[in-house]
């Protein structure tokens, strides 16, 4: 019943905008003007404005009706993989997980884009999954990346994660080989039917070269193990279509899109900036959930420049690793073919961190 009410609400107010929203940039940075007088989608779609806290709380409650994997709502952090002398630095990795546990995050997501999974060997990938589960020790959920452009390989990694004790698996769309929508459906279906843990479909067409269309995601939602969507297309329209038709737990895959996505029924974020300031991103989500839109807007504005430069100065995870080193939490260099941040960009990032109020070591 809750899902039916939520779907009716979203269908009434979200899909029929008067005009298209501004397109996202390559790095999916959503314009701050979206929030100047309340989310544009509210202004275009609602017959009356939300004017008081009671109305806001009612509005928030409608958007937050139970979704399929509600235990993953909130802040998840896309973990970096620390290296030392070219090898995985297990000690520093455990330290980063302890840092997130103390911050009270909902979930950690190792071996994804931020964790440099494309440059890990198969053995290293499995080792990071196992170390994550061991270090988390039940203090937070663990959702490792297990995707591949080979369905058989994705199934193997997902089965390993499930056997190791992962709470869910984050499965990126197949990259490089550009399957059809039917191929994408069959890929995720095969993975979902191979394990008994929830699957989060990760849609990031800027990296994979193929968008998983809303119609395909809606088809996938009919499968019991498909429970979540990591939404990194930059399209509010696409997210709205999925939210209106399914009870999937939708998580933002772009830090700067967290508040816009929450505003249409998203339930949280898988965050890169959470490696630096998990408390602020967690506070943004909690403020929205409590109906304190003014505080949520303030935190969005505070985080915006930091989020923009972590995703815009160079390919992720180059800037986040540089930033962590600058504030005294060094996780080593990135692996080739990625290279360290160039000096002028490093100087800019150092200034961004200092302006944010983070303790930056001198160059």
Sequence positions of predicted segments:
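Catalytic alpha/beta core domains of metabolic enzymes, predominantly
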Residues: 193-194, 205-304, 309-312
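Intrinsic-disorder-associated, low-complexity terminal segments enriched in Asp/Asn/His/Tyr and depleted
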Residues: 27-28, 52
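C-terminal alpha-helical cap/extension of soluble enzyme domains
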Residues: 74-82, 103-105, 114, 263-266, ...
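Active-site beta->alpha loop and helix N-cap motifs at the rims of alpha/beta catalytic domains
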Residues: 67-77, 81-209, 217-219
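N-terminal export leaders
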Residues: 9-10, 34-35, 53
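Extreme N-terminal basic, low-complexity initiation segments
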Residues: 1-13, 17
């Amino acid at each position: 019943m809750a899902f039916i009410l939520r779907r009716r609400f979203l269908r009434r107010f979200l899909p029929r905008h008067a005009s298209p929203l501004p397109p996202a940039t390559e790095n999916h940075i959503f314009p701050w003007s979206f929030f100047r007088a309340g989310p544009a989608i509210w202004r275009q779609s609602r017959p009356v404005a939300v004017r008081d806290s009671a109305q806001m709380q009612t509005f928030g409650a409608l958007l937050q009706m139970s979704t399929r994997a509600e235990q993953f709502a909130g802040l998840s952090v896309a973990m970096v993989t620390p290296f030392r002398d070219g090898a995985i630095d297990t000690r520093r990795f455990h330290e980063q997980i302890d840092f997130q546990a103390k911050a009270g995050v909902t979930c950690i997501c190792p071996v994804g884009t931020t964790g440099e999974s494309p440059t890990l060997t198969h053995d290293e990938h499995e080792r990071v999954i196992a170390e994550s589960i061991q270090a988390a020790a039940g203090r937070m959920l663990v959702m490792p990346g297990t995707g591949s452009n080979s369905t058989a390989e994705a199934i193997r990694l997902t089965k390993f994660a499930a056997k190791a004790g992962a709470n869910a698996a984050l499965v990126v769309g197949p990259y490089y080989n550009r399957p059809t929508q039917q191929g994408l459906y069959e890929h995720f279906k095969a993975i979902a039917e191979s394990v008994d843990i929830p699957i989060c479909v990760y849609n990031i067409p800027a990296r994979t070269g193929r968008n998983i269309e809303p119609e395909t995601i809606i088809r996938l939602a009919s499968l019991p193990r498909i429970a979540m969507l990591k939404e990194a297309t930059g399209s509010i329209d696409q997210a709205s279509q999925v939210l209106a038709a399914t009870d999937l737990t939708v998580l933002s895959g772009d830090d700067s899109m967290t508040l816009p996505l929450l505003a249409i029924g998203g339930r949280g974020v898988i965050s890169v900036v959470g490696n630096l300031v998990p408390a602020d991103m967690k506070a943004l989500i909690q403020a929205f959930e409590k109906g304190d839109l003014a505080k949520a807007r303030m935190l969005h504005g505070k985080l915006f420049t930091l989020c923009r430069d972590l995703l815009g100065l160079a390919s992720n995870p180059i800037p986040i690793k540089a930033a962590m080193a600058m504030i005294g939490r060094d996780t080593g260099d990135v692996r080739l073919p990625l290279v360290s941040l160039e000096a002028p960009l490093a100087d800019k990032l150092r200034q961004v961190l200092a302006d944010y109020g983070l303790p930056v070591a001198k160059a």
